[in-house]
Design a protein with these regions (language model features):
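PP2C/PPM-type serine/threonine phosphatase catalytic domain
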Residues: 1-364
Length: 364
């Protein structure tokens, strides 16, 4: 990825009102409708980050965040061209994602309305103005009531939506030329949030899988390969972190394969450039799985599952929290489990005495 060398976007050059251009013009809007649904939805999320080996920048230049309360996720990729000026673009990306998470959290606490990812991006950009560098960014938010995924993207990060092991939707990227993406930054040639492309995927349904990633993912793996990973993975499970790890490691393997035909190689050939194999880069993957929630608490049985993780040096600690709404009564159960890898099956039913029973099976 190289830094853009374009006229400034903040009034020092011409203002572009056409879609997708640098400056104050608003980016294009894309809308995709999938299938009808009736339940309120929510996301459970997990991530995997594999920075490329660099002793000077062990944290890499990617960053991401997950805000479960706001049902919002995002990724950013600092533009590596800044290294020639002695600037760590990873600092800009990390600051941008940190401010984005704070903004999303603040919106959720002050309003019950769905989070607007464009507002999150704009405020994060403004709050990150004191940091030198530039970065791509892609932020997604779920409107639980409408069952709609709303996203904004600047640059060559992006996301895909999978249903029944098939890719239903893939976002487009923003590039001025090969390997020269749009990028947020306060530098000459930097873009502002208004240039972001906007996406809306309507009528998601339970079981849909959203895969969000930086160019380190998208340059090294095709949608069909992610489909293969999802098929091989036990899709009935809800460990999004594990699925993200599988996808990221598949992309890493491809990036190191000099003989693999990669998306990056194909784009290079279209641009008249010579490149063979994958592209070594930081790889960030965020996986979100769509689940159904029950709108009416007066239904006989309602269950909510959340998994809290604390990653230690050798093992992971899991705490399962089950909440039941049985008629007007409410009960909560905490079931700790120290298994490094957890599999669970959970079922509850109501018998003639109006009692709920629960079963939990854990296996290492």
């Amino acid at each position: 990825m190289i830094a853009a060398n374009k006229p400034p976007a903040f009034g020092l050059g011409p203002i572009h009102n056409c879609y997708g251009c640098c400056g104050y013009g608003r980016g294009p809007y894309h809308k995709k409708k999938l299938n009808s649904r009736t339940d309120q939805l929510h996301l459970i999320c997990g991530s995997c980050y594999l920075p490329k080996e660099n002793k000077e920048k062990p944290l890499g230049e990617d960053a991401h965040f997950i805000c479960h309360d706001a049902q919002t996720i995002g990724v950013a990729d600092g533009v590596g061209g800044w290294a020639r000026k002695g600037v760590d673009a990873g600092e800009y990306a990390r600051g941008l994602m940190n401010h984005a998470k704070k903004t999303a959290t603040g919106i959720t606490r002050s309003s019950a309305a769905a989070v607007d990812p464009r507002k999150v991006l704009s405020e994060a950009y403004a709050n990150n103005a004191g940091v030198q560098g530039s970065s791509t960014a892609c932020i997604l938010s779920l409107d639980k009531e409408r069952g709609t995924l709303h996203a904004v993207n600047v640059g060559d990060s992006g996301f895909m939506v999978f249903r029944d092991n098939m890719c239903f939707f893939k976002s487009s990227t923003q590039q001025r030329s090969f390997n020269c993406p749009y990028q947020l930054g306060n530098c000459v040639g930097g873009d502002c949030p208004e240039a972001a492309e906007e996406f809306e995927v309507e009528e998601l349904r339970p079981g849909d899988i959203i895969v969000l990633g930086t160019d380190g993912l998208l340059d090294n793996i095709f949608a069909s390969e992610i489909e293969e990973v999802i098929v091989a993975y036990d899709v009935s499970g809800q460990d999004c972190e594990e699925l993200a790890s599988y996808i990221a490691n598949r992309a890493l393997y491809n990036s190191l394969d000099k003989y693999n035909v990669s998306p990056f190689q194909m784009e290079a050939q279209k641009a008249g450039r010579e490149h063979v194999g994958g592209k070594i880069d930081d790889i960030t993957v965020v996986v979100a799985r769509v689940l159904a929630s029950t709108k009416n608490k007066n239904k006989n049985i309602y269950k909510k599952l959340s998994i809290e993780r604390n990653t230690g040096t050798t093992t992971r600690a899991y705490s399962l929290k089950f909440q039941f709404h049985i008629g007007e009564r409410h009960k909560a159960f905490d079931v700790p489990c120290q298994n490094a890898f957890l599999r669970y099956t959970f079922s509850c039913f109501r018998n003639s005495a109006n009692l709920a029973k629960r079963f939990l099976e854990c296996a290492t």
